[in-house]
Amino acid sequence: MGARKGRVLLAWELGDGLGHVGRLMPLATRLERDGYVPVLAVRDPAQALRVPAARRLPVLQAPYATPRGARASGFHARSFADILCVIGYEDEERLRAMLRAWRDLARLVRPALAIGDFSPTLALALRGSGVPVMLVGSGFALPPAQDGFFPEVNAEGRAIADREHLAASMRRASGAPRDATPAALVAGDWQGACTWPLLDPYRASRARPAIGPLGPTQAAGP
């Protein structure tokens, strides 16, 4: 066995179900093969550990924000900005706390690379930290950064985001420059939308086409 190359943090922040860990595990397997040490930080450890391959890895509780008030019930977002508002991005103090938690986790793990599935706060927290951030996920979970703001993808959804207030809160909480756009702030260093290009809601505005599924979601164990 060759020398270990360092740790890689594989994170799942938002959403439910096995799909998030299912996308991360093929990457974890390849990283192990290449000499890295994968560490999982997941929204729901019990759910993650239903995936057999995850049981051999260190599993940590990921920081995440619980949707608040009426917004948490029966809510359908019009754009990704509305998702961020539901979890508190317009509340600068709350966002600062979320960023602090992710940064503290990264300091403990000391990863050479972070990979996030539906993990915008991870990307925002590690921006400019020297730790590269690679993002994977469904098409909706990875809005393209080149548009500046988040395109609307659900005309029937409820728009709750105040664009200027959201942008200002994200910049102040993260220490980003005044010209940084919300989409760029959560874009990470590389994105791979794990859906077929035809099914990608951002296909008209995405510079790099969706890459397709990474691999089959591993079956849940007993």
Which residues does each PLM region occupy?
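Short, polar loop motifs at secondary-structure junctions
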Residues: 42-48, 117-121, 194-200
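Conserved nucleotide-sugar phosphate-binding/catalytic loop shared by glycosyltransferases and other
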Residues: 33-93
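Structural motif
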Residues: 7, 112-113, 190
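Conserved nucleotide-sugar donor-binding subdomain of glycosyltransferases
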Residues: 75-115, 119-121, 158-182
